[in-house]
């Protein structure tokens, strides 16, 4: 089975490595991946698997299954340029909300791909741990459970992949946890203690579920791997880009400086603004996201965090 992974960032390379254990994988990226792929391919070859091959777009389109790991803010443009077949079997691994149109990932994708051919990856995982072959459990959300299981069966021995429906719940959980993760980084950076952190995360989970329920997301999704699992991982680890953004803000660094030092995309920054705008439009109560949006715009970090804890 040949799988094409679109996106050469850390997440795309990690997924290429994961799927490479059982399948032939082609990766498509504008950047030269020769050096980043060397160590991954050495590990795959040692397992008796085929190495990942970087190819151009046209060669990638010949694959049977597609995995997309493109930043959400560029996803619509990518679909427009890639011209995937309408019935392509697609697993989208991007998490976030499009700021320009305030659109969920599934809303973007269905403009280009048959909804029955779409799957969405969710759950707690870090690229750095996947490329080490460390175990994790993920969820593949899709209205087409047969397709979700097809993707699940292609995952490596160290990943337990579950097939579930509730696309909207899974993608909102995956986007919203990045917002709470920034707040978690601020909390730890200010050394507010374990009690404050527990309050923040538990109320963050409630807020995430409230927002998701408005759009039809199921409570069990937010209490499972896609929601609580991903939230607790992302909001507690230095491996999380969004958590590191929070740590930087806690040092009173301007957001622009924090992002420059990060050198990578932290989807939670733009997702925060998108969530606040959507919440305002529909009258959804989102105190943590709303306070974080003010912090990102320059509000004092101590004042913002104190207000956040009191309000949440």
From Swiss-Prot:
Catalytic reaction annotation: sn-glycerol 3-phosphate + NAD(+) = dihydroxyacetone phosphate + NADH + H(+); sn-glycerol 3-phosphate + NADP(+) = dihydroxyacetone phosphate + NADPH + H(+)
Lineage: Bacteria, Pseudomonadati, Campylobacterota, Epsilonproteobacteria, Campylobacterales
GO biological process, alphabetically ordered: carbohydrate metabolic process; glycerol-3-phosphate biosynthetic process; glycerol-3-phosphate catabolic process; glycerophospholipid metabolic process; phospholipid biosynthetic process
EC identifiers of the protein: 1.1.1.94
Role this protein plays: Catalyzes the reduction of the glycolytic intermediate dihydroxyacetone phosphate (DHAP) to sn-glycerol 3-phosphate (G3P), the key precursor for phospholipid synthesis.
Top-rank taxon, per record: Bacteria
Protein name: Glycerol-3-phosphate dehydrogenase [NAD(P)+]
Localization, UniProt: Cytoplasm
A GO term, aspect molecular function: glycerol-3-phosphate dehydrogenase [NAD(P)+] activity
NAD recorded as keyword: yes
Active site location: 177 (proton acceptor)
Cellular component annotations (GO), alphabetically ordered: cytosol
Keyword tags: Cytoplasm, Lipid biosynthesis, Lipid metabolism, NAD, NADP, Nucleotide-binding, Oxidoreductase, Phospholipid biosynthesis, Phospholipid metabolism
Coiled-coil positions: none
InterPro entries: 6-PGluconate_DH-like_C_sf, 6PGD_dom2, G3P_DH_NAD-dep, G3P_DH_NAD-dep_C, G3P_DH_NAD-dep_N, NAD(P)-bd_dom_sf
Binding site for NADPH: 11, 30-31, 95, 127, 241, 265, 267
Pathway note: Membrane lipid metabolism; glycerophospholipid metabolism
Family: Belongs to the NAD-dependent glycerol-3-phosphate dehydrogenase family.
Residues where sn-glycerol 3-phosphate binds: 95, 123, 125, 177, 230, 240-242
């Amino acid at each position: 089975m040949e799988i094409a992974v679109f996106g050469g960032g850390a997440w795309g390379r990690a997924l290429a490595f994961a799927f490479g254990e059982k399948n032939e994988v082609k990766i498509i990226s504008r950047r030269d991946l020769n050096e980043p792929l060397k160590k991954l391919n050495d590990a795959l070859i040692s397992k008796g698997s085929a190495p990942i091959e970087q190819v151009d777009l046209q060669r990638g389109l010949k694959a049977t299954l597609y995995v997309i790991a493109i930043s959400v803010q560029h996803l619509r443009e990518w679909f427009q340029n890639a011209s995937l077949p309408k019935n392509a079997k697609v697993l989208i691994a991007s998490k976030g909300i499009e700021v320009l149109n305030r659109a969920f990932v599934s809303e973007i994708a269905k403009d280009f791909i048959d909804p029955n051919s779409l799957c969405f990856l969710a759950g707690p995982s870090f690229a750095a741990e996947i490329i080490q072959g460390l175990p994790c459990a993920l969820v593949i959300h899709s209205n087409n459970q047969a397709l979700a299981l097809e993707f699940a069966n292609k995952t490596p021995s160290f990943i337990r992949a579950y097939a579930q429906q509730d696309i909207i719940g899974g993608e909102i959980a995956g986007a919203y946890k990045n917002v709470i993760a920034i707040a978690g980084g601020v909390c730890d950076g200010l050394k507010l203690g374990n009690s404050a952190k527990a309050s923040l995360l538990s109320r963050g989970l409630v807020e995430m579920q409230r927002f998701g329920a408005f759009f039809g997301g199921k409570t069990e999704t937010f209490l499972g791997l896609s929601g609580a699992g991903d939230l607790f991982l992302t909001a507690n680890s230095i491996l999380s880009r969004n958590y590191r953004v929070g740590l930087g803000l806690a040092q009173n660094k301007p957001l622009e400086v924090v992002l420059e030092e990060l050198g990578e995309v932290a989807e939670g920054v733009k997702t925060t603004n998108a969530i606040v705008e959507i919440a305002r439009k529909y009258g959804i109560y989102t105190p943590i996201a709303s306070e974080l949006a003010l912090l990102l715009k320059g509000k004092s970090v101590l004042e913002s965090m104190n207000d956040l804890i009191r309000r949440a």
